[in-house]
UniProtKB/Swiss-Prot annotation:
EC number: 2.1.1.199
Species of origin: Thermotoga neapolitana (strain ATCC 49049 / DSM 4359 / NBRC 107923 / NS-E)
Name of the protein in question: Ribosomal RNA small subunit methyltransferase H
Entry-linked Pfam families: Methyltransf_5
Record has S-adenosyl-L-methionine as a keyword: yes
Keyword S-adenosyl-L-methionine: yes
Gene that produces this protein: rsmH
Family under the similarity heading: Belongs to the methyltransferase superfamily. RsmH family.
Subcellular location, record wording: Cytoplasm
Length: 300
């Protein structure tokens, strides 16, 4: 594993515990355990509960294992996609859990660690895979997909409404793209200078988000889990808490909760981080938390 000197600060920890309500003898499924920040807080808060943590990123799991070593008798970590959580629990002979947590988005390690390709701040290979065993990389997507398909991805997943086609055209013109700075260059050539100056965030943020979402099938996985898996994994009275970081994710969560006959929504509007937390951890600014409780058996 690469040398790592950056530490991930979990967002909205107090709110996660408030809505998840971990209790002794209960089992919590942390579907995106990452570096173990939320998991540690849950285990510290509830000395008698157990936690199953899963993540597709084998490197962050190594960090989580070290962070959670004091709770080794109450925590089990696995490399897996939360989309396949039902199969994992079946192999563990666990029928239901009492709480589910999803903290979506990219971890600090993925952003700050070397050669992962998630950042536009320095030159790295165009990777962007959360699961390093996956065959689809950002480089493959950017160099092999058609201009039309790239424009669709940037429009839909990056919410780049006005300039998606121009960006896709510049990507194709600049091929082959091999590094993150190659992609930044293509985006900068596509956007008018006044648009670059106008944007509050880095001008390539939306395009990087779009390619990352596509590479990792983030929205498909979230939709599949919420619509077809989550309710079946929860006991009646169990709770699901989801933290999202952009409107595409939040929309899926909101609609899944509202369209379910078996969930009672606990957060009519998304809960946002406190002003104090945003000051201490600017990354939390865009976080939205939604929670629901299973009130009717979710099936086998």
């Amino acid at each position: 594993m690469r040398k790592y000197t950056h530490y991930h600060i979990p967002v909205m920890v107090r709110e996660v515990i408030e809505y998840l309500k971990p209790e002794d003898e209960k089992i919590i499924l942390d579907c995106t355990v990452g570096e173990g920040g939320h998991a540690r807080a849950i285990l510290e808060h509830c000395p008698g509960c157990k936690l199953i943590g899963i993540d597709v990123d084998s490197e962050v799991l190594q960090i989580a294992e070290k962070k959670l070593k004091d709770f080794s008798d109450r925590v089990s970590l696995f490399k897996a996609s939360y989309r396949d959580a039902d199969f994992l629990l079946k192999t563990l002979e666990i029928e239901k859990v009492d709480g589910i947590l999803l903290d979506l988005g990219v971890s600090t390690y993925q952003l700050k660690g070397e050669n992962r390709g998630f950042t536009f701040e320095r030159e790295e290979p165009l990777d962007m895979r959360m699961d390093l065993e996956s065959e689809i990389t950002a480089q493959k997507v950017l160099n092999e997909l058609s201009e039309e398909e790239l424009a669709r991805i940037i429009f839909e997943y990056g919410e780049e409404k006005r300039y998606a086609r121009r960006i896709a055209r510049k990507i194709v013109e600049n091929r082959p793209l091999n590094t993150t700075l190659d992609l930044v260059k293509a985006v900068s050539e596509a956007l008018p200078s006044h648009e670059i100056r106008r944007r509050k965030r880095h001008f390539a943020t939306r395009t990087f988000q779009a390619i990352r979402i596509y590479v990792n099938r983030e929205l498909e996985n979230l939709r599949e889990f919420l619509l077809n898996k989550a309710e079946k994994l929860l006991r009646v009275g169990g709770r699901i808490v989801v933290i999202s970081f952009h409107s595409l994710e939040d929309r899926i969560v909101k609609e899944a909760f509202r369209n379910s006959r078996k969930l009672r929504i606990l957060t009519e509007k998304p809960v946002r981080p406190s002003e104090e937390e945003v000051r201490e951890n600017p990354r939390s600014r865009s976080a939205r938390l939604r929670a629901a409780e299973l009130v009717e058996e979710g099936g086998d």
